Structures are given as structure tokens and as C-alpha cells.
Amino acid sequence: MQFLYHDKDLAVVIKPVGLDSESAVPAAIIAELGGECYTVHRLDLIVGGVMVYARTKQAAAALSRAVQEGTMVKEYVTLVHGMPEESGDWTDYLLKDAKKNKVFVVDRPRKGVKDARLTFTRLSDSDPALVRIRLYTGRSHQIRVQFASRKHPLVGDHKYGARDAHKEPMLYSCCLTFPWKGRELRFEHLPGWADAARLNRIAAMEAAYDRRNPEDLAALAAYMDSGDWRADYEADEQGRIPRCMKRGVLSQDGLYNLLQEVRK
């Protein structure tokens, strides 16, 4: 497990996907650093990214207070199907069905309903689109259900309507900011797939393929001849790549055949 920072009070780590944030991660921190470890916030099992843990009771109290008061800012990146607006500020009422472990957007407050707010900025002009999100409330499945309810399910999120080959939602805790001893600490880490420039290049090449005029096909051929596509389609450290944008024209398996077609 990767450490971004640690001292006698704090440990900031990159939680891997599939590791439980309330048991396995603290155990790994203790095994590496010794002492104690206290959980002050959590991530779902299927979500990776930046987390902070307290190593003393005093630090745990201070960090928990930051969470409760909203001074711990949590930001995420994700890939969503479709292309949402450039930015947004969404507030919804969410209701969780515990038996199904699924959350739904409802139209009015009632027993069991919680309000949920996030803001976001779209970082790429592609489909799927790269989006950066700030959470103002930490509701169960909040990001997943708020985007899915607007017909932009997360790539890989089959529970909330995605129909693609990815095995888990492409959602990552990319940044934590919080007050600490009179100053503000900020820790940021991006996964390999959160590359807006790469997504825009792939989207532009798909658009060129769709248009199929001589200039576009020449640009597409040059892109493939240059070898740039190899870097654009490399898998990240978790083996997940946004390999097929809208229709998967430029998947690795199809590049050779596509190049032959372009050269006709």
C-alpha cells in the first residue's frame, strides 16, 4: 500500500480497490508503522484513492471534527457515460433500500430520506467523460446514484445502469484537504485513467473516423503511425483503461484493421 505522508499523528495512504477501509487498511498501516490507527472516514470496497487515518486519539478527535463540520474537503474523479454539462451543483433526496443495498433519488423528504449535494466540473470533451467532483455530503453511493439518475452512469457501475465491460465503477478519491494545527493540508493523487488530454485525443480520432473525409482520415493515419495511440491505450496500474470511447472504434484489437481501411 502506498503512503503519501505519515508522522506521529497522521497516515495518508492510497487505498487499493478491494481493500476494506475500516479493517484491512488500518491493519496494513499498523503492520507498516506500528502503534495505533483510527478510521475517521471511509471508502466503499470498490473505490480506491486518498484516505487519511489518525494514529492517536487526539488526532482522531480533530479529524472527526473536521468531517462533521465540513472542513474536510473530499474530491473524486470518475468516468461517466455520455457528456454532462461543463459544471453543475446538484442537490437530491436519497433513499437507501438496505435489503437491495441500493440507493434511489426520490422527489420529497420523508422518513429515511437524506439530502445529498455535490458539485462537479467536466474535464474532457469525450464520451465517456472525465469528471471531477466535490462532495458536500457523504451519503451511501451518492456520486453513483446522482449521476445515474441523470442518465450518466459511471463506467463500470452495473448496479446503476452502466452497460460496459469494466468490472467495477471507475471512481477514485483523488484529493483530501483538511485543517491541521493551524494550517491546511492537501493531498492529491490521480489514477492513470484520469487523463483528460488522452481522452480528448481518442474522442477526436473517433470523430475523425466517423466523418471519414480525406483530411480526417489522414490525421487518423498519422496518429496511428506516430505510435501515440500506444501510450493513449496503456492500462493503468489497476489494469483498467477507457479503451472504447463512444463505440469502441479505436480499441486495441481493431487498430490494425482500421489502419488498413484508412489506407484504402
Locations of regions flagged by a protein language model:
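Short terminal alpha-helical segments
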Residues: 195-208
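Small/polar loops that bind or transfer phosphate-bearing groups
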Residues: 55, 135, 226
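Pseudouridine synthase
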Residues: 15, 29, 118, 126-180
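RNA pseudouridine synthases
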Residues: 1-117, 121-126, 148, 170, ...
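Short amphipathic alpha-helical coiled-coil/interface segments
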Residues: 213-221
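Long, low-complexity or tandemly repetitive, helically biased scaffold regions used
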Residues: 222-260, 264
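Short, surface-exposed linear segments at secondary-structure transitions and domain or protein termini
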Residues: 164, 193-194
